[in-house]
Amino acid sequence: MINKTRHNARRYALQALYQWFFCETKPDALISQFMEEHDLSDTDVAYFKEVVTGTIQHVAIIDELMTAHLDRKISALNPVELSVLRLSIYELLHRKEVPYKVVIDEALELVKEFGAEAGHKYVNAILDVLSSEIRKGV
């Protein structure tokens, strides 16, 4: 069963990270803007704030891990798929209490909703490999 408040946090985090991709707004300003413009009443706001801030703070490490498994340059990725991958890799690295299957399932749902038609297949392939690497022994 899907945790709706956590799902909504990821959904808004994806949108915030997508926006950050284009304008690199500071995390606090980005979060404040989302808090003002969206009804987050059915959202795990603390989780939203953490994953947005954490993903942006750790983007260099996240991108380095991801790049080793890409079949193209990171700059050639669809911005939605890139944002979903960054968010999911952050969760795999820093939210170990969240099962890797949940991270992947949520990522696929987000890509199906916001991304290119076959984007979920690409995201699944990358996260499948990375989840094994990151969560070894977990």
UniProtKB/Swiss-Prot annotation:
Gene3D superfamilies in the record: NusB-like
InterPro entries: NusB-like_sf, NusB_fam, NusB_RsmB_TIM44
Gene Ontology molecular-function annotations: RNA binding
Keyword tags: RNA-binding, Transcription, Transcription antitermination, Transcription regulation
Signal peptide, first to last residue: none
Cellular component, GO annotation: cytosol
Disulfide-bonded cysteines: none
GO biological process, one term: DNA-templated transcription termination
Described function: Involved in transcription antitermination. Required for transcription of ribosomal RNA (rRNA) genes. Binds specifically to the boxA antiterminator sequence of the ribosomal RNA (rrn) operons.
Stated family: Belongs to the NusB family.
NCBIfam families (UniProt xref): nusB (TIGR01951)
This protein's name: Transcription antitermination protein NusB
Gene from which the chain derives: nusB
